[in-house]
């Protein structure tokens, strides 16, 4: 624990650009070890981008966020990518909904950066320490319980520094103060260096040891002495006013021709198209590598595989395809017999041969085609929705903070689930026909 207390964060000559906009320029700062540092700034100033950068979610020199500079945790200089030295408590918690609270914490324990030492606490002990019930599913937990679970999972990964992303966003004053007390209690009990990123300075300043101000006008971060903390609201307002289109910029924009504005918009759209196309081509080129079944932990790959098997080949998928098969078989047989020429005379003579032909066509042609289309439509939509929820809820970013290649626990299990479930579903729809 003494190592965690002494671990400080030093940033030198940091430059950050996002979508062509300069967010930070030549920033150098020091976060003291074992303290709570609060970083305040206006909305859209780049606070969350900085947090994701420090957490290792944003690799160096890759679109859409480009950054350069030196990061040093204690005596160790870090280049880029997830490094296990920082843990992040996301604004939306980024908990794995398909796992129990105990499994969420155990996931972090099993993916610690340094597994040469035994974990400090078991998953159940972490839940008990943070006051999180283990029985209810994650979706049934209250907002406060989810936040405590997110903190427990972050601590279980044994990071040196804990990052908090807007922990009081959207909360009323009373709840915000309870969250601030929870952060302070966590820091005192576990003695981890903490960086809290927020625009709610009024709630979080009372727990701060140090305060940093992100000046969006000058694209820098400055330390605010304690005797100037009362001036933070005015300094934030001043920075926001200076950043909101100076008069000279408005004059220049108003005198520009329609062709100039349209040309810039077209160039930006074309650049975005080329960027998206390049990213898609890179993803296609990397598919054989990303789909190679190498996973950090076979146990957890199996858990994710089981989750996607439930989406692709679960009871609802089976019922859906069986009903579709019954409908297809019934309609094919009915309309074939219904519209036979001279049905009264030919049906008794051709019934056996006709049914055999219908069965052959269904099993050899229609069933595989129909099953493939239905599986692609229903199961593909289910998987896409699940991955979309993981992206929106921050779960994919949470995987990155644990140093996990996202294809290992997403792409590989999804492909495996389709390979296992598709033949079973096609057999079921054929059986229904």
PLM region spans:
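Conserved beta-strand-loop-alpha-helix hinge in the C-terminal portion
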Residues: 217-251
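Conserved catalytic motifs of ABC-family nucleotide-binding domains
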Residues: 158
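Catalytic Walker B motif of ABC-type/P-loop ATPase nucleotide-binding domains
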Residues: 162-165
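H-loop/switch region of ABC-family ATPase nucleotide-binding domains
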Residues: 198-199
């Amino acid at each position: 624990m003494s190592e965690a207390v002494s671990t400080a964060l030093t940033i030198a000559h940091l430059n950050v650009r996002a979508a062509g906009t300069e967010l930070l320029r030549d920033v150098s700062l020091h976060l003291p070890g074992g303290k709570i540092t609060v970083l305040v700034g206006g909305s859209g100033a780049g606070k969350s981008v900085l947090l994701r950068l420090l957490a290792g979610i944003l690799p160096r020199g890759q679109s859409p966020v480009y950054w350069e500079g030196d990061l040093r945790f204690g005596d160790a200089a870090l280049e880029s990518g997830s490094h296990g030295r920082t843990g992040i408590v996301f604004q939306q918690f980024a908990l794995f909904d398909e796992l129990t609270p105990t499994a969420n914490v155990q996931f972090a324990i099993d993916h610690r950066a340094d597994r040469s030492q035994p974990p400090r606490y078991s998953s159940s002990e972490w839940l008990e320490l943070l006051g999180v019930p283990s029985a209810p599913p994650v979706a049934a937990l209250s907002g406060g319980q989810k936040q405590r679970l997110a903190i427990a999972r972050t601590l279980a990964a044994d990071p040196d520094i804990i990052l908090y992303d807007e922990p009081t966003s959207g909360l009323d004053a009373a709840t915000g103060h309870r969250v601030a007390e929870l952060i302070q209690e966590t820091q005192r009990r576990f003695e981890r260096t903490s960086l809290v990123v927020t625009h709610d300075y009024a709630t979080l300043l009372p727990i701060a040891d140090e305060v940093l101000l992100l000046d969006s006008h000058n694209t820098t971060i400055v330390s605010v002495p304690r005797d100037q903390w009362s001036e933070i609201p005015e300094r934030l307002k001043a920075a926001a006013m200076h950043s909101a289109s100076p008069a000279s910029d408005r004059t220049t924009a108003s005198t520009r021709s329609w062709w100039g504005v349209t040309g810039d918009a077209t160039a930006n759209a074309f650049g975005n198209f080329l960027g998206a196309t390049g990213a898609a081509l890179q993803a296609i080129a990397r598919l054989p590598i990303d789909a190679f079944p190498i996973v950090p932990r076979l146990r957890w790959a199996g858990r994710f595989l089981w989750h996607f098997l439930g989406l692709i080949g679960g009871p609802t998928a089976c019922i859906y395809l069986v009903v579709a098969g019954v409908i297809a078989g019934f309609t094919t047989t009915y309309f074939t017999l219904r519209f036979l020429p001279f049905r009264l005379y030919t049906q008794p003579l051709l019934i056996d041969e006709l049914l055999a032909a219908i069965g052959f066509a269904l099993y050899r042609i229609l069933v595989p085609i129909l099953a493939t289309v239905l599986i692609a439509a229903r199961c593909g939509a289910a998987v896409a929705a699940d991955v979309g929820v993981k992206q929106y809820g921050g779960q994919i970013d949470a995987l990155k903070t644990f140093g996990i290649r996202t294809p290992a626990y997403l792409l590989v299990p999804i492909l495996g689930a389709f390979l296992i479930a598709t033949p079973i579903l096609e057999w079921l729809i054929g059986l229904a026909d």
